[in-house]
Amino acid sequence: MEKPIFVTQPNLPPLEEFIPYLEIIWQNKQFTNNGPMHQKLEKKLCEFLGVEYISLFNNGTIALITAVQALGVKGEVITTPYSFVATAHSLVLNGLKPVFVDIDPKTLNIDPRRIEEAITPETQAIMPVHCYGNPCDTQAIADIAQKYNLKVIYDAAHAFGVEDDDGSVLRHGDLSVLSFHATKVFSTFEGGAIVCNSKEMKEKIDRLKNFGYIDETNINIIGSNGKMSEVNAAFGLLQLEHMDTFLRGRMNADMFYRQKLKDITGISIVIPSGQKISNFSYFPILVESDFPLSRDELFNYLKNQNIFARRYFYPVIPDFQAYLNVGEVCDVKNAREIASKVLCLPMHAELSSDILEYIVSTIREIK
């Protein structure tokens, strides 16, 4: 395969469909500060996702940082070691102590049993991650939070459009945070959002992302600049028009992989758990000891064949140099083992059957 096959690529609607949105922005001469595109996208996303309130951000990391501030969390926050570093960064940048507990080796999400074991008088919140879009055990986490009077902020960066038996997974917890980065199922180039359940919280979040302003002459809280631009919001509106097509393409790729890889000795496929509607955001496999190559050897072998998989998430967060003396690390042996075996295969809406067959046959031919 001459053309490189990347682990992901952005969903791009026809360029000519984006031009009318840009023309409206040029006519309005408002590029940011809660403009009409921004307002329309918030409304459309609430409808699409089935949530009450949403506040758009310039990226998911600023949204995570702001979510912590909106709830006034102090002290310790229990979270997963198996995630992108922005999860823990949002805590450390707020002066909080992350406490890393282990994951369930089947779902790859934070293990509720480990959460309860790690609670101390300093614990104020839990920050779980719906890893790869697979919902956490939200009921168990809610029960723990209620028992110990803890806040729950879900890092839902992977979970756009995911539903469980209760509806949108974004409705769980006190707040849920989305990422609209170019690599995500739904993208605004760069972007993010906080989903909340009350008008009062939505207003507080909106103030926090706009320097704390109440009106032109009053600030009652110290905030930052987390606003999404009109161009980003416009692209999001256009993306929504094509979401069914994008999701169908990802679903077809997911089904192809599951069918073709299921009987390869030494390759384990992560089984979806808890979702009624999936977004097929990633396709992780686990390279076991009885496969002819190690995970890293397979990673390099695929790269030599122009297939660029990714080791999401390796290493676990507390094993990064920046975290060696930060927070507290409980026994996270499951997370470390999964991190040593995981490999995410290319997954996006435009993977043709020929490309998928090439990826699968490249893996199958390894002896």
From Swiss-Prot:
Molecular functions per Gene Ontology: dTDP-4-amino-4,6-dideoxy-D-glucose transaminase activity; pyridoxal phosphate binding
Residue numbers of N6-(pyridoxal phosphate)lysine PTMs: 184
Enzyme Commission code: 2.6.1.33
Residues forming coiled coils: none
The protein's required cofactors: pyridoxal 5'-phosphate
Protein's UniProt keywords contain Transferase: yes
Catalytic temperature dependence: Optimum temperature is 37 degrees Celsius.
S-S pairs: none
Catalytic activity from the UniProt record: dTDP-4-amino-4,6-dideoxy-D-glucose + 2-oxoglutarate = dTDP-4-dehydro-6-deoxy-alpha-D-glucose + L-glutamate
Swiss-Prot/TrEMBL keywords: Aminotransferase, Lipopolysaccharide biosynthesis, Pyridoxal phosphate, Transferase
InterPro entries per record: DegT/StrS_aminotransferase (IPR000653), PyrdxlP-dep_Trfase (IPR015424), PyrdxlP-dep_Trfase_major (IPR015421)
Gene Ontology biological process terms from the UniProt entry: lipopolysaccharide biosynthetic process
Pathway annotation from the record: Bacterial outer membrane biogenesis; lipopolysaccharide biosynthesis
Presence of keyword Aminoacyl-tRNA synthetase: no
Entry's family note: Belongs to the DegT/DnrJ/EryC1 family.
Function text: Catalyzes the conversion of dTDP-4-dehydro-6-deoxy-D-glucose (dTDP-D-Glc4O) to dTDP-4-amino-4,6-dideoxy-D-glucose (dTDP-D-Qui4N). L-glutamine can also be used as amino donor.
Record's protein name: dTDP-4-amino-4,6-dideoxy-D-glucose transaminase
Record organism: Shigella dysenteriae
